[in-house]
């Protein structure tokens, strides 16, 4: 569809200087939004170098919106819209790619990003030294990729996904990552790849079908929280002497929950780990 040259129908962006100075710097403020015009799909990319990031559902009449408070000496806003592919890239990029830190005003930066609950959303996020809260409840999530660095990230599915999700991928470095409500995500497959950090994958929610998890853990800890009514099969790449989850029987490198044969919903887990610790907690 041809873009209309009217301010009210296009994305709007503006920047103003923040009034308060922090450690010798003042934060600038920037906002951008694009009205919803019946788009069926939206591919969204979020790039955030450092600070606090909040992501969630927005007003139905807005395809996307972002509000920023940022250190203009070290970072610059990112807002790119590609009408041909209905793709938007939002966030903050470092002015000096080789020197991203968390000192000064970087830790005071804030980004609030919202997406329309009406368009099918293909969401990809990459976070640096950030504290992020991502609530995907109320959105039409078709796929998800979350990549974190030295960060603290919480991803929530506070409401059931409005459509079937093909896959959710999580990649965490030296990070704390908590994903809550994966039962509400309606994702056919979840994959996790972790380095050094603490990770929680919580499968609470309104299950509607079976699902799969591929988990690879180098070091750190992985906690799986699974509803007790779900039948679970865990297959490990090799025998793990330290892995003895309660409520499972083992045959070689395959662990099966006691209710697997009678359960109406199933979680099939493929687990690869070297020095990482894995814990299974049952949710009643």
Give residue spans per PLM region:
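Positively charged n-region of N-terminal signal peptides that target proteins for export
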Residues: 1-5
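Bacterial N-terminal signal peptides
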Residues: 7-17
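Short, surface-exposed interaction patches in beta-rich subdomains
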Residues: 22-37, 59, 64-105, 155-284
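N-terminal targeting signals for Sec/Tat export/insertion, comprising classic cleavable signal peptides
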Residues: 30-57
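A structural feature that tracks compact, well-ordered secondary-structure segments
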Residues: 45-47, 123-127, 134-135, 214-216, ...
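Extracellular/lumenal glycan-associated surfaces
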Residues: 50, 128, 277
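Pepsin/retropepsin-fold aspartyl endopeptidases
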Residues: 81-87, 94, 112-113, 119-123, ...
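Right-handed parallel beta-helix
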Residues: 124-163
């Amino acid at each position: 569809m041809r873009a209309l040259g009217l301010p009210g129908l296009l994305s709007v962006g503006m920047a103003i200087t923040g009034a308060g100075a922090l450690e010798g710097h003042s934060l600038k403020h920037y906002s951008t939004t694009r009205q919803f015009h019946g788009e069926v799909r939206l591919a969204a990319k979020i790039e955030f170098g450092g600070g606090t990031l909040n992501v969630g559902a927005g007003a139905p009449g807005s395809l996307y919106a972002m509000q920023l408070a940022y250190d203009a000496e070290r970072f610059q806003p990112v807002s790119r819209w590609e009408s041909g592919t209905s793709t938007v890239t939002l966030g903050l990029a470092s002015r000096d790619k080789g020197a991203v830190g968390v000192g000064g005003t970087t830790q005071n930066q804030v980004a609030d990003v919202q997406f329309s609950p009406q368009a099918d959303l293909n969401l990809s996020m990459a976070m640096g030294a950030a504290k992020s809260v991502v609530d995907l409840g109320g959105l039409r999530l078709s796929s998800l990729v979350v990549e974190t660095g030295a960060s603290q990230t919480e991803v929530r599915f506070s409401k059931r996904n409005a459509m079937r999700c093909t896959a959710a991928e999580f990649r965490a470095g030296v990070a704390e990552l908590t994903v809550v409500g994966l039962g509400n995500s309606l994702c056919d497959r979840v994959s996790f790849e972790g380095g050094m950090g603490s990770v929680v994958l919580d499968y609470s929610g309104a299950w509607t079908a079976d699902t799969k998890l591929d988990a690879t853990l180098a070091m750190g800890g992985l906690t799986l929280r699974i509803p007790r009514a779900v039948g679970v099969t865990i297959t490990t790449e090799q025998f793990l002497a330290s892995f003895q989850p309660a409520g499972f029987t083992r045959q070689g490198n395959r662990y099966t929950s006691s209710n697997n044969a009678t359960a109406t919903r199933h979680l099939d887990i493929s687990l690869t780990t070297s020095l990482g610790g894995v814990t299974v907690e049952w949710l009643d």
